[in-house]
């Protein structure tokens, strides 16, 4: 994929000048780290509520068995954004798309922070999910700005920012909620998101449009006049035609169902006796999964060396094993911390591998492919969130653990079943 860049001082010649970012040269040093920061901040908004579920449920009088709907609606909004907004990354100027969505995300966060009742809260959270998909457009942007030989590292760096954002989301959310109330979490995030929009407007190339191989314009469904509806529908067509995309998407659904099962459900046993932890302490457990950020970078380097299949298998095996210590949460917080480290490491290793592998299938359709893949991610997260709440109501933490382990084992078995198929899953 080539990137057309123009309108920036100091870049002349060719599509974007010899100093322009793209497959033939590295992006400016500050762009990928800034994209990583913005990705992490955007995705964090989806996870702020996790350590606050008990607080929000009590504040807005939600049934304990259905408190997971807070996360589920946010994830459903995210899924809608993946289908409706992410494909625009292959159609429009990505700089305007990224900065515009960040600005709207800031407004949605403001709406959450000022919500007067449950209905307004849930609508605003769905809007946050819808607009937080800007992170996936930024992943595709980072991949497009980087030469193929270094693309795995760039995707790993940006995905590492996402992982770090998820982890810090829980910790920061808990701390701010204890210090200034839960509303402060969303109001501070709204201001930070607005600042990032301004910074990226200055840092990204003035014009960024996807192109096909050899610099030709990227394929437009229905020709150059193809409608937006056809463009969105083409995402479904891509997954219907490419078995590798469907396999990797299903793996994402199962892996993130397991991920969401843990992080949606864990607030309840930690806030109940014998632990009775505060929001700050509950959020701090998200830091136990900091290994996930390390996994993102390691997986990116392994993928650049052609080890995607091995990375997938090891990651899924570790994911299954992580539920053994997680199941001991009622007896030991150290066991939960150890299990969270293993789970986050495994999930992010598989996630980075998935994104690197699927982008190579059709580079000129990178935004649509990543958007379609992340629909599976979001569906799995919504399934895990709702399933976790229902499982806890039915059988407590042991039932939640069993559900998460079942999702993880299903992913490992799917990967094993496809080892002898063509194309391989990694």
What are these regions (language model features)?
Residues 190-212, 414-418:
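C-terminal membrane-cytosol helix-exit motif in multi-pass small-molecule transporters
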Residues 309-354:
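C-terminal transmembrane helical hairpin of 12-TM major facilitator-type secondary transporters
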Residues 125-162:
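Cytoplasmic helix-loop-helix junction between adjacent transmembrane helices
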Residues 80-118:
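Conserved MFS/SLC helix-loop-helix module at the cytosolic interface between two early adjacent transmembrane helices
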Residues 17-26, 205-249:
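Juxtamembrane intracellular "pre-TM" segments in multi-pass secondary transporters
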Residues 156-202:
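Helix-loop-helix hairpin linking two adjacent transmembrane segments in secondary transporters
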Residues 81-93, 295-308, 392:
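Helix-to-loop junctions at the C-terminal end of transmembrane segments
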């Amino acid at each position: 994929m080539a990137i057309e860049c123009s309108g920036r001082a100091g870049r002349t010649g060719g599509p974007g000048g010899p100093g322009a970012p793209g497959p033939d040269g590295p992006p400016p040093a500050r762009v990928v780290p800034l994209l990583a920061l913005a990705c992490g901040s955007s995705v964090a908004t989806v996870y702020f509520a996790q350590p606050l579920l008990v607080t929000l449920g009590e504040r807005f009088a939600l049934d304990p068995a259905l408190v997971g709907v807070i996360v589920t609606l946010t994830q459903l909004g995210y899924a809608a954004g993946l289908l409706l907004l992410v494909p625009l990354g292959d159609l429009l100027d990505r700089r305007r798309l990224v900065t515009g969505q960040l600005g709207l995300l800031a407004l949605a966060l403001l709406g959450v922070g000022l919500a007067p009742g449950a209905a307004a809260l849930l609508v605003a959270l769905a809007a946050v999910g819808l607009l937080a998909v800007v992170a996936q457009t930024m992943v595709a942007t980072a991949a497009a700005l980087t030469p193929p030989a270094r693309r795995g590292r760039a995707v790993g760096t940006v995905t590492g920012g996402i992982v770090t954002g998820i982890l810090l989301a829980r910790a920061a959310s808990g701390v701010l909620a204890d210090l200034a109330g839960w509303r402060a979490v969303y109001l501070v995030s709204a201001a930070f998101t607005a600042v990032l929009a301004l910074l990226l407007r200055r840092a990204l190339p003035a014009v960024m449009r996807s192109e096909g191989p050899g610099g030709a314009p990227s394929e437009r469904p229905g020709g150059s006049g193809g409608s937006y509806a056809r463009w969105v529908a083409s995402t479904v067509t891509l997954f219907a035609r490419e078995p590798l995309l469907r396999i990797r998407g299903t793996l994402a659904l199962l892996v993130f169902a397991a991920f969401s099962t843990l992080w949606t459900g864990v607030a309840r046993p930690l806030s109940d006796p014998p632990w009775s932890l505060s929001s700050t302490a509950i959020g701090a457990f998200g830091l136990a999964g900091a290994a996930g950020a390390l996994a993102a970078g390691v997986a990116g380097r392994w993928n650049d060396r052609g080890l995607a299949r091995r990375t997938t298998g090891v990651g899924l095996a570790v994911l299954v094993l992580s539920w053994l210590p997680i199941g001991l949460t009622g007896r030991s917080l150290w066991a939960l911390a150890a299990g969270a480290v293993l789970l986050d490491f495994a999930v992010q290793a598989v996630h980075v591998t998935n994104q690197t592998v699927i982008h190579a299938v059709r580079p000129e359709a990178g935004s649509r492919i990543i958007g379609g893949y992340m629909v599976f991610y979001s569906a799995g997260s919504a399934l895990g969130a709702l399933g976790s709440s229902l499982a806890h109501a039915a059988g407590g933490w042991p039932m939640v653990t069993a559900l998460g382990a079942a999702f993880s084992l299903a992913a490992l078995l799917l990967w094993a079943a496809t080892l002898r198929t063509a194309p391989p899953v990694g």
